[in-house]
Swiss-Prot record:
Catalytic activity: L-glutamate 5-semialdehyde + phosphate + NADP(+) = L-glutamyl 5-phosphate + NADPH + H(+)
HAMAP family membership: ProA
Name assigned to this protein: Gamma-glutamyl phosphate reductase
Functional note: Catalyzes the NADPH-dependent reduction of L-glutamate 5-phosphate into L-glutamate 5-semialdehyde and phosphate. The product spontaneously undergoes cyclization to form 1-pyrroline-5-carboxylate.
Subcellular location per the Swiss-Prot or TrEMBL entry: Cytoplasm
E.C. code: 1.2.1.41
Enzyme class, UniProt record, top EC level: oxidoreductase
Naturally occurring in which organism (per UniProt): Aliivibrio fischeri (strain MJ11) (Vibrio fischeri)
Signal peptide: none
Gene3D superfamilies linked to this entry: Aldehyde Dehydrogenase, Chain A, domain 1, Aldehyde Dehydrogenase, Chain A, domain 2
One Gene Ontology term, aspect cellular component: cytoplasm
Cysteine disulfide partners in this protein: none
Length: 418
């Protein structure tokens, strides 16, 4: 596999995509959605191969859930693509404009970034999400998925490329690095002649490797510890529902709850509710104060927290629990333990809510809402290419606008500079 050739093809495709009309891009998206449903048997058969290999390799059930495609999930993915069709195309839109004193009309106009390289692990739906958003914004993409979803991704990329050709767009608009060789990833990270942005979606190790080795700007997406703080003023019964949704609705998601912080004034009552709700489903990993309260209950899966536990993105039915004195201690804990993704406070106190919002360093902060809302579709952005946990160039769910840059456009009447 020659990555230089792929890069050259992607760059050429990016020029075509940059000037493709919205109608043509939407046509390609519509065909992708239809082809996903028309080829469901082949896609699900390929996914079965990936799941079988995962079981044989002893991959955790949480990770297997990330790999799994079902007919229902496939329909959902196709509908997500159709939702992207209905979103406004940001390419060519003016961000702002003004007329200068010299008579020049000056504006900033949204343009595609160019070629985007995305390195991701496990979830096959990411392949479609990335391709559809890049296509809508006129960007070519080079994808490198995890070896765990090799067969699924190959089938999905085949569907995408067929759809592109049917719509009259270059098949090289979306390319896939088939070999799992890590050396190819290292090579991709240095292809700054062809690739304009790298987005790694995975764990801390992948992010670190990309930041240290890439000569291309990197957007860090996905990893971060998510927290919920139950304040003393919270409606405890309703707070429990939010905590349960944050943790247990889909624990393998990157926006699932990792650490629960509970105000000491309500800790005995709330932890009793928590145990009653989560016994037999969730393992609790508790610091000393919380452990002292939780060990009194029967039927709880419980262990004492060890060093590093509160820095762990669990992605499973495990939850860190800590009792804190107030919102200030909650904020201090979050700052220490990589609160960069999604955090929520459950409270009926406006001052506590505002303090939490202002001190939380995460990309998405909620008041009385589940952390599970940090998602492009939930935010009305369509699908997402990543959830950026850094502060530049984008932050939070990266939808269409976050996949564009801008150019300055000046219009005048044969104007010269004096």
């Amino acid at each position: 596999m020659n990555l230089t050739t792929m890069g050259q093809a992607a760059k050429a495709a990016a020029f075509d995509l940059a000037v493709a009309p919205t109608a043509q891009k939407n046509k390609a998206l519509a065909i992708i959605a239809d082809e996903l449903e028309a080829n469901k048997d082949a896609i699900l058969a390929a996914n079965e191969k990936d799941i079988k290999a995962a079981v044989e390799a002893g991959i955790s059930e949480a990770m297997q859930d990330r790999l799994l495609l079902t007919e229902e999930r496939l329909v959902g993915i196709a509908n997500d693509v159709r939702n992207v069709i209905n979103l406004n195309d940001p390419v060519g839109s003016e961000i702002d404009s003004k007329v200068l004193e010299n008579g020049m009309s000056l504006s900033r106009r949204r343009v595609p970034i160019g070629v985007i390289g995305v390195i991701y692990e496990a979830r096959p739906n990411v392949t479609i999400d990335i391709a559809s958003l890049c296509l809508k914004t006129g960007n070519a993409s080079i994808l490198r998925g995890g070896k765990e979803t090799f067969f699924s991704n190959m089938e999905l990329v085949k569907v995408i490329q067929v759809a592109l050709e049917k719509a009259g767009l270059p098949a090289a608009s979306v390319q896939y690095i088939e070999k799992p060789d890590r050396e190819l990833v290292s090579q991709l990270l240095t292809m700054d002649d062809y690739v304009d942005m790298i987005i790694p979606r995975g764990g801390a190790g992948l992010h670190k490797m990309c930041k240290e080795n890439s000569s291309i700007p990197v957007i860090i997406g996905g990893f971060g510890i998510s927290h919920a703080f139950v304040d003393e003023s919270a409606d405890l019964e309703r707070a429990l529902v939010v905590v349960d949704n944050s943790k247990a609705q889909r624990p393998s998601a990157c926006n699932a709850l990792d650490t629960l912080l509970v105000h000491e004034a309500v800790a005995p009552q709330f932890l009793a509710l928590l145990v009653n709700n989560m016994a037999g489903r969730v393992e609790l990993v508790a610091e000393p104060k919380a452990y002292g309260l939780l060990k009194e209950f029967e039927g709880v899966s419980l262990r004492e927290a060890q060093e590093g536990d509160f820095d762990t993105e669990w992605l499973s039915y495990t939850l860190g629990v800590k009792v804190v004195a107030d919102v200030n201690e909650a904020a201090a804990h979050m700052q220490k333990h990589n609160a960069s993704h999604s955090d929520t406070i459950l409270t009926n106190n406006i001052e506590s809510a505002e303090k939490f919002i202002n001190t939380a360093g995460s990309a998405a902060v909620y008041v009385n809402a589940s952390t599970r809302f940090t998602d492009g579709a939930q935010f009305g952005l369509g699908a997402e290419v990543a959830v950026s946990t850094q502060k530049l160039h984008a932050r939070g769910p990266m939808g269409l606008e976050e996949l564009t840059s801008y150019k300055w456009v000046g219009k005048a009447d044969y104007l010269i500079r004096s």
